[in-house]
Design a protein with these regions (language model features):
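Conserved active-site and cofactor/substrate-binding residues in soluble primary-metabolism enzymes
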Residues: 49, 75, 79, 96-99, ...
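A conserved short coil-to-beta-strand element within the FAD-binding core of flavoproteins
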Residues: 49-60, 94-111
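General structural feature for long, well-ordered alpha-helical segments within catalytic domains
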Residues: 31-35, 80, 84, 97, ...
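Rossmann-like flavin
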Residues: 1-87
Length: 197
């Protein structure tokens, strides 16, 4: 959130906390308690929530306790991406769209990136392929190719919820993501819709 504040990024940022509820008693012991101790040891503003504490925070008794980070929160990811591009451009970065990198090599004190339209020289290089790493990795970053794991995802949003409903379901608007391997999450957006996936 420091980056959001430092560059005045308009991305619906809400630093209202993050809670990770445990979907089973075993996950509470193995993940919530362990993560709490690890983060607390490093000075993070965290809390361990038992089942009753968690129910009062998120409005369901489905979970078995959890872990909370009071400095966490959530953003609109598309708005954040656009704002990061804006801030980067305002600070001298040049963004090349629709120009896939075919290869790159270190050259002097920088990099040469080869694209179908020609070469680009830069002082810094970031390989940021996101969902397309699997397609790009063998040529661009062979070490990344072994780290690619397919993930399926979906999202849906409710209609804007009334104050009455919001007072019982995550009333403090924290970001929630559980301990499933294929995690489930929910958060409110700026229009008071509950986003889940």
């Amino acid at each position: 959130f420091d980056l959001v504040r430092d560059h005045d990024l308009e991305c619906e940022a809400e630093q209202s906390g993050w809670i990770q509820p445990a979907h089973s008693p075993g996950r509470f012991k193995a993940i919530s308690e362990k993560r709490y101790r690890q983060w607390e040891k490093h000075g993070a503003d965290v809390e361990l929530l038992d089942k009753a504490d968690l129910e009062s925070r998120i409005g369901t008794n489905f979970f078995f306790g959890g872990f909370g980070n009071k400095t966490g929160g959530h953003v609109n990811p598309l708005a954040l991406t656009r704002e990061l591009a804006r801030a980067a451009a305002e600070n001298g970065a040049v963004i090349y769209e629709r120009s896939p990198a075919m290869s790159y090599t270190e050259e002097g004190d920088g990099w040469r990136v080869t694209t179908p339209a020609g070469n680009i020289r830069s002082r810094a290089l970031v390989v940021a392929t996101n969902a397309y790493t699997g397609e790009a990795a063998p040529a661009l970053a062979p070490r990344l190719a072994r780290s690619v794991m397919p993930i399926t995802s979906w999202q849906l949003a409710t209609a804007p919820l009334s104050d009455n409903v919001r007072s019982t379901v995550v009333p403090d608007r924290q970001a929630i993501s559980d301990t499933h391997g294929d995690l489930h999450f929910f958060r409110y957006d700026a229009r008071n819709r509950l986003i889940t996936g």
